[in-house]
Amino acid sequence: FGIVEGLMTTVHSITATQKVPTPDVSVVDLTVRLVSWYDNEWGYSSR
């Protein structure tokens, strides 16, 4: 477990018993980044 850029992540290592037995199957690593932003227009309304 760890904190990376404010997100909680879980890291799993692949052991010898978890390896895929057939060479035609591969593991794909996908990285997803979620960016959210909220603007309540407080700066515009308080001008």
UniProtKB/Swiss-Prot annotation:
Keyword entries, A-Z: Cytoplasm, Glycolysis, NAD, Oxidoreductase
SUPFAM superfamilies: Glyceraldehyde-3-phosphate dehydrogenase-like, C-terminal domain (SSF55347)
Marked site (Activates thiol group during catalysis) residue numbers: 12
Annotated EC: 1.2.1.12
Reaction(s) the record says it catalyses: D-glyceraldehyde 3-phosphate + phosphate + NAD(+) = (2R)-3-phospho-glyceroyl phosphate + NADH + H(+)
Compartment(s) of residence: Cytoplasm
Recorded GO MF terms: glyceraldehyde-3-phosphate dehydrogenase (NAD+) (phosphorylating) activity
InterPro entries linked: GlycerAld/Erythrose_P_DH
Any one of the GO CC terms: cytosol
Oligomer status and interactors: Homotetramer.
Family the UniProt entry places it in: Belongs to the glyceraldehyde-3-phosphate dehydrogenase family.
Protein name listed in UniProt: Glyceraldehyde-3-phosphate dehydrogenase, cytosolic
Native organism: Pseudotsuga menziesii
